Every structure is written in C-alpha cells, then in structure tokens.
Regions:
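N-terminal secretory signal peptides that target proteins for export/translocation
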Residues: 1-7
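Carbohydrate-interacting regions of secretory-pathway proteins
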Residues: 24-250
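Bacterial N-terminal signal peptides
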Residues: 10-21
C-alpha cells in the first residue's frame, strides 16, 4: 500500500501547485488568444534604449538572449520597449534575479520594473505607470513623469515631471534598501534565483497587479491608459521569459 499512498500524496502536492498557479483566474477578464512578445529567440517586438547610448544601440550587450530567456545585465540604465502600443490587455511575464548589482545601486535592493502605458519621447524614465520589481517590494506602483493613478486607498498620486511617486503594494511591511532584502511581513517573491510570475490586467483606466497569483496592487483612473510596455535595466542583473499579452474581449 505504500506506493499508492506515495502517489496520492504526490498528486495532492501537484494539485496544490496548480491551485497556486491559477489563483488569479477569477480575477482575469475574458481575453483572446496570446500575442507572444518574446519567443525565446530574438527581440522582434522590441526596441532597446540606453541612457548613455540611445535607441537600438547596445554595444555592451546589456540585453541579450541566453538559453531561450532574456538576460538583462543591469550594468546600464535603460530598457526593452515594445514597438507597438497596447490598451485593454492581460500581460503575463516571468522573472528571476541574477547576482550582480551595479552603480549607482551597487549593494542596494535589486531593482527593475515593467513600465506600461508608456507615452512620450524615449528617455530614462518616460511617462508611465510602473509595475515595480524590487526585492522586498515587488508589486508597488510608481507613477513617473506625469503618470497618475488612484490607489486602493482612494488617494490619487501624480508623478512630478522628471521624477516619480510610489504607492506601496497591499499589505507591504517595512522595507530596507539592501541587496537580498525580503519583506518580513508579506513577501510575495519566491526565494532568490527562482522564477516569479507577474500578471497585469489593464482594463480601460483600471489596473491590477499580481505577483505569484496574489493581488499585489490595484488602481483606477490611470493616466495614461494606453501605450507601450517596457522592461527595465536598473542596476541589477535579472532574467525575463514567457512574455505574453492577451487582448481583453470587449
């Protein structure tokens, strides 16, 4: 009887994992077929921008494809940005941290982000709303360079020109800006080196951000409410994969 019991326990474990993986399904609006933004081979759907080198000029290979995933060195500030603008969509992407941290954020909490509804000229950083990716705070909102959002507490936050303001994720504990930091109250990231699932629902001017199946933040009256999507290089090595966008059904 030991073998069947062992298989039964294993099955329960797999079912538990599936429950976690699909925990947000009831929160996701009906959507169409996926648009694969990254196919594991190249950056067909993206441009690159680096603060020191400009558009589509990456001499130091800050962005690359390694074993079917995107490698971001983090050594220069910049981003991968979609060539196309989007509105009303469900975005899925996975990320994991590498090891390196670099000036001006050497030794600080590893930092990146997905900026969406991006409008205006290419620069560091353009008008947008950000799905923050940072050790101890993944899921925060940042409103950048005129980007604006009304947070879950009903307070509207507008990012001043040339800078940004934050709305902490729901249930966030105290934060410390050091490499490797983890939220002692409600950490949403998996342990360092493991893949994390990020999900974004942008429906009209309403946005929801999920980290590993849990609602991390929610906002309304987003400005802008459409635009390009970018993935940051901001002083920390990390990897992205499985980037897919699903248009919401009308």
């Amino acid at each position: 009887m030991r073998t069947p019991v062992r298989h039964f326990v294993r099955l329960l474990g797999l079912l538990a994992l599936a429950t976690v993986a699909f925990a947000t399904s009831s929160e996701i609006a009906p959507h169409g077929a996926a648009i694969t933004l990254f196919d594991g081979r190249d950056f067909t759907h993206f441009d690159t921008f680096l603060k020191e080198h400009g558009l589509n000029n990456d001499p130091d290979h800050v962005f690359g494809v390694v074993n079917g995933v995107i490698h971001v060195s983090g050594k220069e500030f910049g981003y991968l940005i979609t060539k196309q603008e989007f509105a009303n969509y469900y975005l899925r992407a996975e990320f994991k941290w590498g090891e390196g941290t670099y000036a001006p954020r050497a030794g600080q909490a590893r930092d990146s982000g997905i900026l969406y509804h991006v409008q205006g000229p290419q620069k560091v950083w353009p008008t947008s709303v950000e799905f923050q990716i940072i050790e101890g705070g993944t899921g925060d909102f940042w409103m950048t360079d005129g980007g604006a959002l009304t947070g879950p507490n009903g307070v509207r936050v507008i990012g001043p020109p040339g800078t940004a303001l934050k709305i902490d994720r729901i249930g966030k504990g105290p934060w410390n800006n050091v490499a490797g930091y983890r939220d002692p109250v409600g950490e949403l990231e998996r342990p360092h080196g493991q893949w994390n699932l990020l999900e974004l629902v942008a429906q009209g001017d309403h946005v929801k951000q999920f980290v590993n199946g849990k609602l991390a933040n929610e906002g309304s009256e987003a400005f802008p409410s459409s635009g390009k999507i970018l993935f940051q290089s901001e002083g920390a090595e990390l990897f992205f994969r499985k980037i897919k966008l699903y248009p919401l059904k009308k």
